[in-house]
């Protein structure tokens, strides 16, 4: 991508396209990260992020990608077994992290085409006690959205904490951290927040962080107990990725200006528009293109489009690139038979129309219509 392309050409489901003024904000001089100027910057970031998380709790800022805070969630969950809900590539990663941190982890689910059912979760919770469960709110590999409010209600009846990866949920679809009593919810900078990659943000409930002290082997870099201590001083435990913090402050203010509710609505409209486009495309070209996610569990931020047998999703992605737009290929086991359009972050309906038109043209070319 050339640095001179106009905004509205990059529809990867992460990293997402960043507004020029947000990029520009990173070109500020360094600051000592212990001192008043930094604390002011950090407080500004908190004012931006808290309404996005819908929380009164402080927002931890980790200089890592989102996977870092997934690991932190596992390391800091109170002692006990962990139930991992798997319905896609990223929820599978969460389960792998639990196992690789030496936790007693049980997987429930496994099907990619829908959320893990509450029945299956309840069966598992009845069978034995779990300290926590892991869930991916918006599965970026499939476009499937899980109802984390209902899941949390259920889990809390069994005294099981809920660790939520909302990496492509937060700032694109409603997340009510406080009202839904989420124990820990995390995201990365480079998805629906439309910041460059390199930061992760998370919120822990008071109960979760109080119990985290009992977790042994939390390590150092991802010890949320440390994050909690520093966040109250408007600081981070270690040297933060300062340039990205400048961008976060500016983006938080941009999002406040739009309002989080309007941002959610814009994402809903982008999702609906993309889905209608898929259905019209299928009719027009007479080939089995479809939306992978079930109609009642779609995320607003990304659509995985299934392609008919015999059509190469890779050829579609490459043809779209020749027209000046970036979309995503399939992910994991859906690599060959889906492509993905990331309609999240700061994209507009007009921008989305342009990439969909380029994609339709490409498909007609690939099908030789
Ligand atoms: C992108 C993504 C991640 C991983 O994020 P990194 O920033 O690459 O570590 C985790 N979960 C979901 C749902 C994602 O979309």
Regions found by a protein language model. Give the residues of each.
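Conserved PLP-dependent catalytic core of the aminotransferase class-I/II
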Residues: 44-53, 253-291
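Conserved beta-loop-alpha segment that forms the PLP phosphate-binding cup at the N-terminus of a helix
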Residues: 56-83, 87, 91-95
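Conserved active-site segment immediately N-terminal to the catalytic lysine
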Residues: 178-190
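Active-site phosphate-binding strand-loop segment of PLP-dependent enzymes
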Residues: 116-171
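Conserved PLP-binding catalytic core of the aspartate aminotransferase-like
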Residues: 287-319
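Active-site C-terminal subdomain of aminotransferase-like
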Residues: 17-18, 190-276
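A glycine-/small-polar-enriched, mobile loop at the entrance of the PLP active site in fold-type I
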Residues: 5-63
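PLP-dependent enzyme catalytic core of the Aspartate aminotransferase-like
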Residues: 3-5, 333, 337-369
């Amino acid at each position: 991508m050339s640095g001179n392309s106009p905004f509205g050409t990059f529809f990867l489901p992460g990293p997402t396209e960043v507004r020029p003024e947000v990029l520009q904000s990173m070109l500020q001089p360094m600051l000592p990260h212990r001192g008043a100027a930094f604390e002011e910057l950090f407080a500004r970031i908190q004012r931006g992020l808290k309404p996005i998380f819908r929380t009164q709790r402080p927002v931890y800022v980790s200089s890592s990608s989102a996977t870092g805070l997934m690991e932190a969630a596992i390391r800091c969950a109170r002692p006990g077994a962990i139930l991992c809900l798997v319905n896609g590539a990223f929820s599978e990663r969460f389960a792998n992290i639990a196992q690789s941190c030496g936790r007693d982890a049980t997987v429930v689910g496994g099907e990619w085409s829908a959320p893990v059912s509450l029945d299956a979760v309840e069966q598992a919770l009845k069978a034995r006690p779990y300290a926590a469960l892991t869930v991916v709110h918006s599965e970026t590999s499939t476009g499937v959205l899980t109802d984390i409010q209902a899941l949390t209600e259920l889990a809390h009846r069994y005294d099981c904490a809920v660790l939520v990866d909302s990496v492509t949920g937060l700032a694109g679809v409603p997340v009510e951290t406080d009202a839904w009593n989420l124990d820990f919810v995390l995201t990365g900078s480079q998805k629906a927040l439309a910041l460059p990659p390199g930061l992760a943000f998370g919120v822990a409930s008071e109960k979760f962080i109080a119990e985290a002290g009992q977790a042994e082997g939390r390590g150092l870099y991802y010890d949320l107990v440390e994050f909690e201590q520093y966040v109250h001083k408007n600081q981070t435990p270690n040297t933060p990725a300062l340039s990205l913090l400048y961008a976060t402050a500016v983006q938080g203010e941009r999002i406040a200006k739009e309002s989080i509710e309007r941002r959610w609505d814009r994402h809903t409209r982008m999702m609906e528009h993309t889905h209608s486009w898929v259905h019209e495309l299928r009719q027009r070209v007479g080939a089995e293109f479809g939306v992978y996610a079930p109609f009642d569990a779609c995320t607003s931020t990304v659509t995985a489009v299934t392609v008919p047998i015999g059509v190469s999703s890779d050829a579609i992605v490459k043809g779209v690139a020749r027209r000046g737009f970036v979309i995503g290929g399939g992910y994991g086991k859906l690599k060959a038979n889906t492509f993905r359009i990331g309609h999240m972050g700061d994209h507009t309906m007009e921008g989305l129309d342009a990439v969909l038109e380029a994609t339709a043209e490409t498909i007609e070319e690939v099908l030789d219509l």
